[in-house]
Amino acid sequence: MAVAGGRGCVRSLREGVLWRSSPCHCDYTATRHFLGALQKLPLQAWVRKVHTAPLRTLFLLRPVPILLAAGGGYAGYRQYEKYRERQLEKLGLEIPPKLASHWEVSLYKSVPTRLLSRACGRLNQVELPSWLRRPVYSLYIWTFGVNMTEAAVEDLQHYRNLSEFFRRKLKPQARPVCGLHSVISPSDGKILTFGQVKNSEVEQVKGVTYSLESFLGPRACTEDLPFPPASSCDSFRNQLVTREGNELYHCVIYLAPGDYHCFHSPTDWTVSHRRHFPGSLMSVNPGMARWIKELFCHNERVVLTGDWKHGFFSLTAVGATNVGSIRIHFDQDLHTNSPSYSKGSYNDLSFVTHANKEGIPMRKGEPLGEFNLGSTIVLIFEAPKDFNFRLKAGQKILFGEALGSL
């Protein structure tokens, strides 16, 4: 009995020695000492310690807690900034926009939003079992305030997947098209900004601008594009204004996830050209538009250009996170959010052919395209100087309601 007990002790001692000398025990001990040391260090020293720690030790810390800590700290910082802004607003002080630095934009763009958006697109196409449809759609309706009484089909069981639910049609009487005004809202959404375009800079929100040429792309020299020839000394804005006495106007409409996701023709016009810019898929909510300069120029977008009765007219659908899919009903060659693309590239397609020398005629209110989720519509158009917007920044608007008129 004593001999057996002695052998057990020897075996335990030997196993303990082997464990202590094993790589796992060394890593465990190193990690434990590393974490213990971190608890006694101030924040700056902790960051320095993390940067100088062995790779194997950092791997054993597990990435999830590190990401949660980093993300939580950054979210807390952003919440503090928002709190400070609210306090300044209460005092009646105008808050200048605090733009993201170059490294913050680069860090955000490093997030694989295109891959995540493609994954979400695939997930949205998965057919849901009948028993799961009502709870899933009801949760979405409750979260984003969707008004299903406007839907052509109110029965949630009718929608086989999330994609069909996002692209649901409305009852004809739900969105009457205003016939008295020359330009109507192409979609449901929130008005971010509007007004005249000056010095080839366009406001994405108040105080934050983007380059008109970067957004629409360089003026092409082909005859079928709706850009008139201009001398090199003219600004890009002046190249778009085709008639004497006219001005260039813009309007930005943000579509939230709970909004109706289709967009329509805002006026009677002819679409002669499409330009597709592959790009990032960063969020385009008003907070991000206030934070990142030229956000719309970074993101994937589809620019439709043409003419209306007063000259140049364009509608741009801007993609966003989980909104990599932009569909134009009459453009079957358009494929957005492709796995690979060249930075700064764009694809042109002319709708002017020998058989159709004018382009695609669109009537006011006619269906034009759709998103898979909320995003942004940007209108840039030429009109006489007495064109007046009937809007307020920040107001909610529905498809068919008036944007402005002469």
From Swiss-Prot:
It catalyses: a 1,2-diacyl-sn-glycero-3-phospho-L-serine + H(+) = a 1,2-diacyl-sn-glycero-3-phosphoethanolamine + CO2. This is Phosphatidylserine decarboxylase proenzyme, mitochondrial. The keyword Plastid does not apply. It comes from Rattus norvegicus. Pathway: Phospholipid metabolism; phosphatidylethanolamine biosynthesis. Belongs to the phosphatidylserine decarboxylase family. PSD-B subfamily. Eukaryotic type I sub-subfamily. Is synthesized initially as an inactive proenzyme. Formation of the active enzyme involves a self-maturation process in which the active site pyruvoyl group is generated from an internal serine residue via an autocatalytic post-translational modification. Two non-identical subunits are generated from the proenzyme in this reaction, and the pyruvate is formed at the N-terminus of the alpha chain, which is derived from the carboxyl end of the proenzyme. Residues 1-49 form a transit peptide. Its cofactor is pyruvate. GO terms for biological process: lipid droplet formation; mitochondrial protein catabolic process; phosphatidylethanolamine biosynthetic process; protein autoprocessing; regulation of mitochondrion organization. The lineage of its organism: Eukaryota, Metazoa, Chordata, Craniata, Vertebrata. The record marks G374, S375 as: Cleavage (non-hydrolytic). GO terms for molecular function: phosphatidylserine decarboxylase activity. It holds the Pfam family PS_Dcarbxylase. It is found in: Mitochondrion inner membrane; Lipid droplet. Inhibited by hydroxylamine. Heterodimer of a large membrane-associated beta subunit and a small pyruvoyl-containing alpha subunit. The active site is at D188 (charge relay system), H264 (charge relay system), S375 (charge relay system), S375 (schiff-base intermediate with substrate). Optimum pH is 5. InterPro entries: PS_Dcarbxylase (IPR003817), PSD-B (IPR033177), PSD_type1_euk (IPR033661). The modification Pyruvic acid (Ser) is found at S375. It is an enzyme of class 4 (lyase). Binds 1 pyruvoyl group covalently per subunit. Its EC number is 4.1.1.65. Residues 80-406 are mitochondrial intermembrane.
